[in-house]
């Protein structure tokens, strides 16, 4: 049994494009983490999520966590509209990194990794930022935007895996294929 340890509808949708038979069991892990380097931060949270769900239900478990970072700071999910505004203003006109750490526990062994994608935002006016915030879209997303939704308008270019920016890099699908899971 393949288990996705995530409540994210975006991760569920991407995995479902390539693998049909899996179960969703969200983890009960807090997303609080004292680590400050994006790769180690995302990997640690992915491992915690995968281990917690594996200990509850067994099977092959996928845990993932995505971190948006700029200037050495990790931007989590905004806690308020004002925080979303500050994040989007910080990203405006600049390049940032999106790092997704993943952990797959298969037959008791862990396979983990991290994927990094660079994203360049266009210059954003305050009017556009507030219009986007009023849609509600940024409030449950790291870095306060969703590239797959209205937030995609802000992106000038990306360097790397688009699906990583959404939160589920295709490297995970390839790892599952290597572990014997049927893809497509």
Swiss-Prot record:
Enzyme class, spelled out: hydrolase
Q: Is Hydrolase included in the keywords of this UniProt record?
A: yes
* UniProt keyword annotation of NAD present: no
List localization entries.
Cytoplasm
* Residue numbers annotated as active site: 65
For molecular function, the Gene Ontology terms on record are: dTTP diphosphatase activity; UTP diphosphatase activity
What InterPro entries does this protein map onto?
ITPase-like_fam (IPR029001), Maf-like (IPR003697)
Query: Positions of the site: Important for substrate specificity?
Result: 10, 66, 148
Write the Enzyme Commission number(s) for this entry.
3.6.1.9
Coiled-coil intervals in this record? none
What cofactor does this chain's UniProt record say it requires?
A: a divalent metal cation
Its GO CC terms?
cytoplasm
The protein's UniProt keywords, in alphabetical order, are: Cytoplasm, Hydrolase, Nucleotide metabolism
SUPFAM superfamilies this protein is in?
ITPase-like
In terms of superkingdom, the source organism counts as Archaea
Quickly give the catalysed reaction.
dTTP + H2O = dTMP + diphosphate + H(+); UTP + H2O = UMP + diphosphate + H(+)
* One record GO biological process: nucleotide metabolic process
Its family remark reads: Belongs to the Maf family. YhdE subfamily.
| HAMAP family registered for this protein in UniProt | Maf (MF_00528)
Protein name in the entry: dTTP/UTP pyrophosphatase
Which species does the entry assign this protein to?
Thermococcus onnurineus (strain NA1)
């Amino acid at each position: 049994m393949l288990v996705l340890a995530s409540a994210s509808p975006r991760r569920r949708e991407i995995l479902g494009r390539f693998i049909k038979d899996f179960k969703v069991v969200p983890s009960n892990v807090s997303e609080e983490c004292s680590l400050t380097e994006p790769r180690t931060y995302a990997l640690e949270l992915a491992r915690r999520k995968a281990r917690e769900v594996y200990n509850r239900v067994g099977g092959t478990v996928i845990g993932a966590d995505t971190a948006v970072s700029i200037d050495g700071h990790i931007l989590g999910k905004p806690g308020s509209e004002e925080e979303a505004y500050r994040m989007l203003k910080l990203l405006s006109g600049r390049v940032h990194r999106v790092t997704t750490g993943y952990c797959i526990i298969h037959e008791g062994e862990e396979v983990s990794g991290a994927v990094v994608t660079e994203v360049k935002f266009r210059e954003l006016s305050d009017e556009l930022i507030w219009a986007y915030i009023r849609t509600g879209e940024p409030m449950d997303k790291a870095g306060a935007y969703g590239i797959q939704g209205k937030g995609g308008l802000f992106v000038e270019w990306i360097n790397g895996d688009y699906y990583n920016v959404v939160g589920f890099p295709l490297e995970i699908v390839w790892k599952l294929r290597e572990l014997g899971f049927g893809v497509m």
